[in-house]
């Protein structure tokens, strides 16, 4: 388990507290709403209250140009304007009006308004401040208004960009979550024996120790769609899988109330959601694996589909060894390459 300290940045820079103390010191959330509340901000605020943490609220101005990110749409009139410090302060004040009654006096918070690409600005602020947790919605709250087509089973480009470039845990919420559920008393960890999954498990254990929770380790056996796969074979595979699951998890779970769950299925995301509902969990923890398809990197279909459909919060952790590099160069590249269509984001290993 010592090797995990070298891989998991958030645990190296910000060691997790013992039970009863603060789990998080700095929590970042992002919203594209100005005049109404966003579920991700309300959820982040509740977690900040529980941990006496600083809350960082980010709003990235909607751009009217793929070339110049300072050319934006006015949040009231919708007209194209060039942003300025005065305009950004006006937007910040409007956002503050929406949340001031919810946040004060119990939450120490900061609101930042800036032009740019949302996922890049999230990464920038996260790394400037050493953020412990990022809270996001699976899609833009204004996706339909912006003309963005939501693909069933897919998370938005902002969440995807953050997950692929940052191993700070990302909490994905589909709606505002009740305060009681945010105590994270029943946590499900999806286990596929990967390094990212190991990071997610370690993070989930620290949460369980903080909140005195029960942790469920779940593994799905892929069931081949052939008639020759007998009940005897399935039972033997189940025994072997549970043994492997215990060997993988036991070092992490020795001081945590836990249960091992193994069953067969064809689609991992459906079985994870089924297990979450059956065990009435209030958090699903997953490891993310960046993948490449036709020149484009993405976060992994199981993570996407679970995050998109889950009724409870989903926390995603990515192994640092599979993160894509980001050196804050993409924005400048797009400014200079005016022919580039920003709706197609191509990443390389360089």
Residue ranges and their predicted role:
Residues 113-122, 263-271:
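Charged docking surfaces used in two-component/phosphorelay signaling
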Residues 9-15, 20-22, 46, 50, ...:
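Gly/Ser-rich helix-loop-strand patches that form or flank binding pockets
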């Amino acid at each position: 388990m010592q090797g995990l300290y070298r891989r998991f940045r958030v645990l190296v820079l910000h060691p997790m507290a013992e039970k009863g103390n603060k789990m998080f010191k700095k929590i970042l959330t992002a919203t594209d709403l100005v005049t109404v509340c966003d579920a991700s901000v309300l959820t982040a605020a509740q977690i900040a209250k529980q941990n006496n943490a600083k809350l960082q609220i980010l709003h990235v101005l909607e751009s009217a140009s793929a070339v110049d990110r300072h050319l934006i749409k006015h949040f009231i009139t919708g007209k194209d304007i060039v942003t300025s410090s005065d305009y950004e302060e006006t937007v910040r004040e409007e956002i503050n009006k929406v949340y001031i009654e919810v946040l004060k006096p119990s939450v120490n918070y900061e609101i930042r308004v800036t032009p740019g690409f949302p996922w890049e600005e999230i990464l920038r602020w996260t790394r400037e401040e050493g953020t412990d947790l990022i809270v996001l919605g699976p899609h833009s709250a204004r996706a339909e208004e912006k003309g963005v087509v939501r693909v069933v089973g897919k998370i938005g480009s902002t969440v995807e960009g953050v997950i692929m470039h940052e191993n700070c845990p990302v909490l994905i919420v589909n709606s505002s979550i009740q305060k009681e559920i945010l105590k994270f008393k029943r946590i499900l960890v999806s286990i596929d024996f990967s390094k990212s999954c190991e990071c997610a498990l370690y993070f989930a254990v620290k949460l369980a120790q903080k909140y005195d929770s029960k942790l469920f380790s779940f593994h799905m056996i892929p069931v081949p769609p052939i008639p020759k796969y007998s009940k005897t074979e399935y039972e033997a595979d189940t025994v072997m899988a549970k043994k492997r699951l215990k060997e993988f998890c036991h070092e992490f779970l020795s001081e945590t109330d836990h249960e091992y769950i193994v069953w067969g299925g064809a689609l991992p995301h459906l079985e994870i959601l089924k297990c979450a509902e059956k065990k009435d969990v209030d958090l699903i923890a997953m490891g993310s694996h960046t993948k490449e398809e036709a020149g484009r990197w993405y976060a992994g279909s199981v993570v996407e589909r679970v995050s998109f459909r889950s009724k409870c919060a989903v926390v995603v952790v990515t192994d640092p060894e599979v993160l894509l590099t980001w050196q804050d160069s993409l924005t400048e590249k797009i400014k200079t390459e005016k022919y580039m269509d920003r709706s197609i984001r191509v990443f390389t290993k360089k």
